[in-house]
């Protein structure tokens, strides 16, 4: 199955750590599902708001909130790895959802910030935008954990988020290598990410 192949490129897909979908499991584990759904939500928001060229650094409030969202996945992951507690599906999907929703902002800042330019356009105009994005991402993860009929939609969304995230890293690399050349960086990056993940997924299955 295509979605399973794409998920295999980046995720262990352990059945006991994944949500059920149909007769099997979702293409990504609970934590990765949260991460990549959050990533897709954030990228969709930034695209709709025409912020893909934004490069102004975060406000203090946005920077603090963004940093705080990284803590849950680190604490839960390390705590369960070292045996301090046993993580569960809710903790996995929520910690993934929170960090996934803030990663695209970091990527945009890394790609677009230019100390020689004014960097006038903000990634988030108000901290409220970031808060709402986080609530929506976490809400979808919580709904999935509750058993709401979201598995099919979020399975597709998570794989799209996977392509967007790795496409973002390719985009960052291309922008650094090519400088100010006017090229369709985003389209090239998404195509490269898709092909790379598809090939790796096939090798990992």
Which residues are covered by each model-predicted region?
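Secretory/periplasmic and organellar redox-cofactor proteins
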Residues: 1-18, 24-25, 33-42, 46-205
């Amino acid at each position: 199955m295509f979605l399973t192949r794409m998920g295999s490129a980046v995720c262990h897909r352990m059945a006991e750590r994944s949500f059920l979908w149909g007769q099997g499991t979702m293409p990504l584990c609970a934590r990765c599902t949260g991460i990549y759904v959050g990533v897709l939500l954030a990228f969709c928001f930034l695209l709709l708001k025409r912020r893909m060229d934004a490069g102004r650094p975060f406000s203090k409030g946005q920077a603090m909130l963004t940093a705080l969202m990284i803590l849950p996945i680190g604490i839960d992951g390390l705590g369960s790895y070292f045996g301090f507690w046993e993580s569960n599906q809710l903790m996995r999907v929520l910690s993934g959802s929170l960090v996934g929703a803030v990663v695209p902002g970091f990527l945009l800042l890394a790609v677009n910030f230019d100390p020689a330019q004014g960097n006038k356009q903000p990634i988030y105009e108000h901290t409220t935008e970031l808060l709402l994005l986080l609530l929506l991402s976490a809400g979808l993860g919580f709904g999935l954990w509750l058993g709401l009929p979201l598995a099919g939609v979020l399975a597709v969304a998570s794989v799209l988020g996977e392509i967007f995230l790795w496409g973002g890293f390719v985009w960052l690399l291309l922008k650094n290598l090519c400088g100010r050349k006017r090229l369709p960086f985003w389209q090239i990056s998404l195509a490269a990410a898709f092909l790379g993940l598809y090939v790796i997924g096939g090798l990992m299955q």
